[in-house]
């Protein structure tokens, strides 16, 4: 009954106005699944390959027609007739069909679109929501949002070197109340920036990109806004950073262009430790460059016992890189981006590996998103307890928050908001 009978892909437009891949899957019983693929701005060197056409005369070279054709031809031929419920077999077939270690032949964007739409179709065939189909009866934990309200780095045109400054409403009783707190703080911050004559236009992920000189300047604005909105920093709301340090790691040092300062890996670790001591920062993502294993070890040894250290570029949701990082004692948390690895099965494998090793996992969007809300369901399915899906602006970000609100309502009394327990340092 769940045999795949039709596969169709198309080019659609993502939140940055660039083409991306959308895939429709139809099953023998009429069940239907659709998934759209996200795209990153700051990408790790070890991510699975997102295939772009490169034809400068169309979409400025960013078209994905080749990936769409791969789905409609090779991938369709390979998976039509297979059972959608056999997710791991289908994903293994897609990996084998591509035949490269980084999914570079067919494109991770082609493969992921097929993989996720298969899961959605199978869930519909079972008459189950996606989170329940993937996660089973134990899927009931609503994640704490990491809300990106000030942007710098590759996500902004300002001097701030760090890429994201986030709030986490850990003290809220429910996911809905966490979203409300985030919204109130977001609007309070907007007024504070406006009153100081700073820009309040929003970036790719819905956060502000004011012309501030340094990370402490951004953190001070956020702290004041939390308090003005009626919340207590460190209790109701804590802070998180995404340094995206790979972007400014040059010749063995961290070049803070905005501050005019260069820091060695040891000095970088000291700087981050100092920020975490001065502010209620409980999570730091990509605090070191993706290849600076020595720096990661220094940072983990220094503050890993009290701060969540999230590997994004370091691990790229890749079970092999994660296994090596666990073995070497690098970081203590995995950022999960489905398009970094390219199939649902490998994504779930990485999350399971992290959780077995005592690492936390954070489900994440990309800077180029669509209305697709799959990651909201996956956050609940895996009980990972944390999600990064942008600020409280832009419908491509709010689609995920709104889906989480619906899931919380649907779960009713069995819903559990992760709160402070999501981060071991706060437990």
Swiss-Prot record:
Which principal EC class is assigned to this enzyme?
lyase
Q: How is the cofactor bound?
A: Binds a second Mg(2+) ion via substrate during catalysis.
Q: Which cofactor does it need?
A: Mg(2+)
Question: What EC number(s) has UniProt assigned to this enzyme?
Answer: 4.2.1.11
Task: Respond yes or no to whether keyword Cell wall biogenesis/degradation is given for this record.
Answer: no
Q: Name one GO biological process term.
A: glycolytic process
Spell out the molecular function terms from Gene Ontology.
magnesium ion binding; phosphopyruvate hydratase activity
Q: What does this protein do?
A: Catalyzes the reversible conversion of 2-phosphoglycerate (2-PG) into phosphoenolpyruvate (PEP). It is essential for the degradation of carbohydrates via glycolysis.
Q: What is this protein called?
A: Enolase
The protein's organism comes out as: Rhizorhabdus wittichii (strain DSM 6014 / CCUG 31198 / JCM 15750 / NBRC 105917 / EY 4224 / RW1)
